């Protein structure tokens, strides 16, 4: 790509102030320096400023997280549609957009699953984002409490569904 020791790859990681984000940014910068010889600068700021800058597109590489609001692939995939306000990286792929549009309009679960698989292949090929880690949720639940949802990807707990076992 034309990069070498005299002309290293240079870019900036943009993230909000938080200890975990800083550790991840430092680890990435170190690894990219070691593996690619990249000169990676770190830029951190307070949350409100970070959101404003990120939403205006004032970054080269940004830290962000995605949380599913519902248990369906579109909860993540829709955020990469070129017209989505959640597409802060401004990635655009017309074929991806068309596949997602088609998936949203089909009632056939098998067809929709196949369309999502095709969309995910495009993401894997173009890499508009780099998944770094998944934050695990660890819960300690008193065995006397019943109704606590075990398989709950959104981590929503409605207290009206909880009860004390006798």
Provide a role label for each language-model segment:
Residues 20-27, 31, 49, 72, ...:
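Extracytoplasmic/secreted proteins, especially bacterial periplasmic and envelope-associated proteins
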Residues 22-27, 56-60, 145:
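Short glycine/threonine-rich loop-to-helix capping motif typified by GTGT followed
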Residues 16-24, 42, 46, 65, ...:
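Extracytoplasmic/periplasmic, Sec-exported soluble proteins
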Residues 1-20, 62-65, 107-143:
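Bilobed periplasmic-binding protein-like "clamshell/Venus-flytrap" ligand-binding domains
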Residues 13, 33-81:
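Periplasmic binding protein-like
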Residues 31-34, 40, 104-105, 110, ...:
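Conserved C-terminal helix/tail region of periplasmic/extracytoplasmic solute-binding proteins
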Residues 1-30, 34, 90-95, 118, ...:
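Append "and occasionally in soluble cytosolic enzymes with long acidic Gly/Pro-rich linkers
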Residues 2-8, 53-57, 75-105, 134-166:
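Short, solvent-exposed loop/beta-turn-alpha elements that line the ligand-binding surface or hinge
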């Amino acid at each position: 790509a034309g990069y070498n020791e005299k002309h290293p790859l240079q870019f900036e990681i943009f993230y909000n102030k938080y200890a975990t984000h800083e550790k991840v940014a430092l680890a990435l910068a170190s690894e990219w320096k070691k593996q690619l010889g990249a000169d990676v600068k770190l830029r951190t700021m307070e949350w409100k400023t970070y959101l404003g800058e990120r939403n205006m597109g004032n970054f080269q590489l940004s830290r962000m997280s995605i949380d599913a609001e519902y248990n369906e692939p579109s909860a993540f995939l829709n955020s990469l549609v070129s017209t989505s306000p959640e597409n802060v990286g401004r990635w655009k792929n017309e074929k991806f957009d068309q596949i997602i549009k088609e998936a949203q309009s089909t009632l056939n679960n098998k067809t929709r699953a196949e369309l999502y698989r095709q969309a995910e292949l495009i993401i894997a090929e173009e890499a508009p984002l780099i998944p770094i880690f998944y934050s695990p949720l660890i819960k300690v639940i008193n065995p006397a409490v019943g109704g606590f949802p075990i398989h709950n990807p959104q981590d929503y707990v409605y207290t009206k569904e909880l009860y004390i076992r006798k």
